[in-house]
A protein has these predicted regions:
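Single-pass membrane-anchoring alpha-helices
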Residues: 4-38
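N-linked glycosylation sites
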Residues: 61, 70, 86, 146, ...
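A short beta-strand motif characteristic of beta-propeller blades
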Residues: 165-167, 213-220, 264-267, 314-316, ...
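Repeated scaffold domains used in trafficking and secretory/extracellular systems
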Residues: 173-182, 222-230, 272-279, 347-351, ...
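Short, aromatic- and glycine-rich surface loops/edge beta-strands on solvent-exposed regions
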Residues: 192, 239, 420-428
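Structural motif
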Residues: 200-204, 249-253, 297-303, 372-378, ...
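Blade-level signature of beta-propeller repeat domains, shared across WD40, Kelch, NHL, RCC1
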Residues: 437-469
C-alpha cells in the first residue's frame, strides 16, 4: 500500500470512528432527556390520589444510578401509593402491657409554656403515632387558665403532636372542638370536631386538612363523640356520637364516613341502655366499641358495628369485675352480659376493654369511688360467661394514691398482628386540688406485649405546690 492509500485509509477509519462517537453522544443526550421527563411522570400522581405524606414524614425514594460513559443519571422511582387500611391481621397474643410513652406535661408546665388540656387520646397513621387533646385556648402559666375546669367553651381546640411531644406553643390546632375523635384511613387523617352551643352544636368532619361535611345536633342536648380514635376499614370510617341526656335516655347514632363525607347513619340497637365516650378498635371485618353507661350500669356497654351493611348490635361486658367508676366492690358487683347492672350507674368515666377469645382485657381506676389509681388485668371468660370474676395478670399503672382520669384504646398494626395499646389521662388541679385555679392533664401510654414485664407506678408526678396558681 503506497503512502497515499495509507493516508486515505487512516482518514476513512478516523471519520468512521468520529461518526460513531457523534451518534453515541446523541443517544446519550436523548436518554438523559427521556429519563428526566420520566422522573416527573412517575412523581406526579393523579389529582384524586392522596399520597401517604404528612408534614413530619420524610419520603425516602430508592435511587438507581445508571452510568453512560462519563455521564451519571439519577432516576427517582415513584413512592408507593398509599392504600386504605383494612386491619385484617389477627390480634396479637399478649401476656400484659409494657410502658410505651409519657409526656410529663404538668411537670414541664412549671417552667415552660405548655397548653392546658383535657380529654387526651392517641391514634396512629401507618408510620407514626400521635397524641391528641382538647386544649383550653391557653397555656398553664397564664391567667386565662383560671377556671378551666369547664369543658365546653368556644376557645377549645383539638391539638395534635407526635406521641411523646408535649403540647407546646408550636402545636398544631387541628380544629375547633370541645369533643372530638380522629383516625387515619391509610391515606389521610379524619377529624370529627364538635363545638358550639350546648343546645345547637355542630360536628365538623375534616379530612386531609379540609372541611368536607358537617352535621347539627339532632337532640339539642350536648352533641358529643368518643374522645378517642375512630376506626377506618377499606376507606370507610365509623364514629359513635351521642346527643341527649347524660343521666337518662339519649339518642346515640353511628356515623359512617368516606373521605370526610357522611355516607350513612345508623341508630343504636340492641340491649345497651346508655352509650357515650366509646373506645373503639378494629375487629375485622367490623369494628367493636366498649363505652360508658352514664345512667344505669357500672358494667360497660359493647357496640358491634358491621361495616358492610351498617347494622348495629349492642350488649354489656360479661365480666363481674366491672370497669366503670363509681362501682360496687368486686365481691358485690355483677354483670350478666345483656343488660345494665343497675349498680352505681349514675356518673362514670371513659374507659376501655377488648376481647381475647372468650376472655377480656380491661383497665379501670383502682378506687371504686373516685378517679384515683389505675390497673389492668385479664378476666377469664369475661367476654362470654356472665359474672365471670377469675382475674389474672393484674398490673398497677398508677398507684391508688395518685389521680387518674379518662382512658381509652388505640390499635397499632405490626408485621403479623394488630396490637392493642391504651392511654391513661392523669388529671391535675381543680376540682380536687384547690391550691391552684386550673385543671389540666398529662398522659401515660402502655402497649400489649408478649414478653415479660416488671412492676411500677407512673403517676403525673408534679408537685402541686411548685406549680403556677
Amino acid at each position: 500500500m503506497n503512502p497515499n492509500q495509507k493516508i486515505i485509509t487512516i482518514g476513512s477509519v478516523s471519520l468512521t470512528i468520529s461518526t460513531i462517537c457523534f451518534f453515541m453522544q446523541i443517544a446519550i443526550l436523548i436518554t438523559t432527556v427521556t429519563l428526566h421527563f420520566k422522573q416527573y411522570e412517575f412523581s406526579s400522581p393523579p389529582n384524586n390520589q392522596v399520597m401517604l405524606c404528612e408534614p413530619t414524614i420524610i419520603e425516602r425514594n430508592i435511587t438507581e444510578i445508571v452510568y453512560l460513559t462519563n455521564i451519571t443519571i439519577e432516576k427517582e422511582t415513584c413512592p408507593k401509593l398509599a392504600e386504605y387500611r383494612n386491619w385484617s391481621k389477627p390480634q396479637c397474643d399478649i401476656t400484659g402491657f409494657a410502658p410505651f410513652s409519657k409526656d410529663n406535661s404538668i411537670r414541664l408546665s412549671a417552667g415552660g409554656d405548655i397548653w392546658v388540656t383535657r380529654e387526651p387520646y392517641v391514634s396512629c397513621d401507618p408510620d407514626k403515632c400521635y397524641q391528641f387533646a382538647l386544649g383550653q385556648g391557653t397555656t398553664l402559666n397564664n391567667v386565662h387558665s383560671n377556671d378551666t375546669v369547664h369543658v365546653r367553651t368556644p376557645y377549645r381546640t383539638l391539638l395534635m403532636n407526635e406521641l411523646g411531644v408535649p403540647f407546646h406553643l408550636g402545636t398544631k390546632q387541628v380544629c375547633i372542638a370541645w369533643s372530638s375523635s380522629s383516625c387515619h384511613d391509610g391515606k389521610a387523617w379524619l377529624h370529627v370536631c364538635v363545638t358550639g352551643d350546648d343546645k345547637n352544636a355542630t360536628a365538623s368532619f375534616i379530612y386531609n386538612g379540609r372541611l368536607v361535611d358537617s352535621i347539627v345536633s339532632w337532640s339539642k342536648e350536648i352533641l358529643r363523640t368518643q374522645e378517642s380514635e375512630c376506626v377506618c376499614i377499606n376507606g370507610t370510617c365509623t364514629v359513635v356520637m351521642t346527643d341527649g341526656s347524660a343521666s337518662g335516655k339519649a339518642d346515640t347514632k353511628i356515623l359512617f364516613i368516606e373521605e370526610g363525607k357522611i355516607v350513612h347513619t345508623s341508630t343504636l340497637s340492641g340491649s345497651a341502655q346508655h352509650v357515650e365516650e366509646c373506645s373503639c378498635y378494629p375487629r375485622y371485618p367490623g369494628v367493636r366499641c366498649v363505652c360508658r353507661d352514664n345512667w344505669k350500669g357500672s358494667n360497660r356497654p359493647i357496640v358491634d358495628i358491621n361495616m358492610k351493611d351498617y347494622s348495629i348490635v349492642s350488649r354489656y361486658v360479661c365480666s363481674g369485675l366491672v370497669g366503670d367508676t363509681p362501682r360496687k366492690n368486686d365481691s358485690s358487683s355483677s354483670s350478666h352480659c345483656l343488660d345494665p347492672n343497675n349498680e352505681e350507674g349514675g356518673h362514670g368515666v371513659k374507659g376501655w376493654a377488648f376481647d381475647d377469645g372468650n376472655d377480656v382485657w380491661m383497665g379501670r381506676t383502682i378506687s371504686e369511688k373516685s378517679r384515683s389509681g389505675y390497673e389492668t388485668f385479664k378476666v377469664i371468660e369475661g367476654w362470654s360467661n356472665p359474672n365471670s370474676k377469675l382475674q389474672i395478670n393484674r398490673q398497677v399503672i398508677v398507684d391508688r394514691g395518685n389521680r387518674s382520669g379518662y382512658s381509652g384504646i388505640f390499635s397499632v398494626e405490626g408485621k403479623s398482628c394488630i396490637n392493642r395499646c391504651f392511654y391513661v389521662e392523669l388529671i391535675r388541679g381543680r376540682k380536687e386540688e384547690t391550691e391552684v385555679l386550673w385543671t389540666s392533664n398529662s398522659i401515660v401510654v402502655f402497649c400489649g406485649t408478649s414478653g415479660t414485664y416488671g412492676t411500677g407506678s407512673w403517676p403525673d408526678g408534679a408537685d402541686i405546690n411548685l406549680m403556677p396558681i
